[in-house]
Curated annotation (Swiss-Prot):
Primary enzyme class: lyase
Name used for this protein in its record: Methylthioribulose-1-phosphate dehydratase
Superkingdom in the source lineage: Eukaryota
GO terms classed as biological process: L-methionine salvage from methylthioadenosine
GO cellular component: cytoplasm
Cofactor(s) listed: Zn(2+)
Record-linked InterPro entries: Aldolase_II/adducin_N, Aldolase_II/adducin_N_sf, MethylthioRu-1-P_deHdtase_MtnB, Salvage_MtnB_euk
Residues noted as binding substrate in the record, renumbered to the chain: 99
Lineage: Eukaryota, Fungi, Dikarya, Ascomycota, Pezizomycotina
Keywords: Amino-acid biosynthesis, Cytoplasm, Lyase, Metal-binding, Methionine biosynthesis, Zinc
Pathway(s) where this gene product acts: Amino-acid biosynthesis; L-methionine biosynthesis via salvage pathway; L-methionine from S-methyl-5-thio-alpha-D-ribose 1-phosphate: step 2/6
Family of the protein in this entry: Belongs to the aldolase class II family. MtnB subfamily.
Function: Catalyzes the dehydration of methylthioribulose-1-phosphate (MTRu-1-P) into 2,3-diketo-5-methylthiopentyl-1-phosphate (DK-MTP-1-P).
Source organism of this protein record: Ajellomyces capsulatus (strain G186AR / H82 / ATCC MYA-2454 / RMSCC 2432)
Length: 240
């Protein structure tokens, strides 16, 4: 088992700077709760700063998270087994996030922040894609202005109005951590993606930094909601 230097290593999460990860994560979670993305303790967020990973805890009402609730991991750290992960701060009586290995997969791709939501719009589009395209289909949409808020890929700029945004979809599992291999396979198959949908569950979104991850998550949720409404009206998501 990895050694823990100090379970109460509080200086890592104490800062007056609102941009510090231990302050940003609670602020993000409150924001996401207001959108209905992290209700019932679901969802989460993680930020990488230098060689530290800051992660929201599991099983905690996300709108009530405080800086002292944040877990801190040394990075890099093994995804598996959980006992090998190098926590340098573990809040007493709180559980590490079950999303941890999935967040680590995003950080291994160079992300600075990863967000997981249980957005209803994300769940609905996974069901619509399954019905229309089958279980192997991905979400696609084009000719919508908000697509410009999503990157083409690392160092490739942003998508344009006439481009087709593609987001892969993976199947849900009984346990969150068991999604990791499917998530990594989707990342390999779609190397330019900054998000992966999980059918009947939600979405993982990552970005180069906190602001990009947040705005990309917002843009995607807008597009998912729009796609559901377009479907009701019989409008195609991809313009021919």
């Amino acid at each position: 088992m990895a050694a823990i230097k100090d379970e109460n290593n509080d200086h890592l999460v104490q800062s007056d700077n609102p941009e510090h990860p231990s302050n940003l994560i609670p602020a993000l979670c409150r924001n996401f709760y207001s959108h209905g993305w992290v209700t019932g303790t679901g969802g989460g967020a993680s930020i990488k700063r230098d060689n530290h990973i800051f992660i929201a805890p599991s099983g905690v009402q996300k709108e009530l998270i405080q800086p002292h609730d944040i877990f801190v991991l040394q990075y890099p750290t093994p995804k598996y087994p959980p006992s090998a992960r190098q926590y340098i701060r573990k809040p007493v009586e709180l559980k590490p996030s079950a999303c941890t290995p999935l967040f680590l997969a995003a950080f291994d791709r160079g992300a600075g922040c990863c967000i997981h939501t249980h957005s209803q719009w994300a769940v609905l589009v996974t069901l619509l894609v399954e019905r229309e395209k089958g279980p192997e289909g991905c979400f696609e949409i084009s000719n919508i202005e908000q697509i410009k808020g999503i990157p083409r890929g690392k160092g490739k700029g942003m998508l344009g109005f006439f481009d087709t945004l593609k987001i892969p979809i993976i199947e849900n599992t009984a346990f969150e951590e068991d999604l990791t291999s499917s998530l990594e396979e989707a990342m390999e198959k779609y190397p330019d993606t900054y998000a992966v949908l999980v059918r009947r569950h939600g979405i993982y979104v990552w970005g180069d930094d906190v602001a990009k991850a947040k705005t990309q998550c917002e843009s995607l949720d807008y597009l998912f909601q729009l796609a559901v409404e377009m479907h009701k009206l019989g409008l195609p998501w991809v313009k021919s």
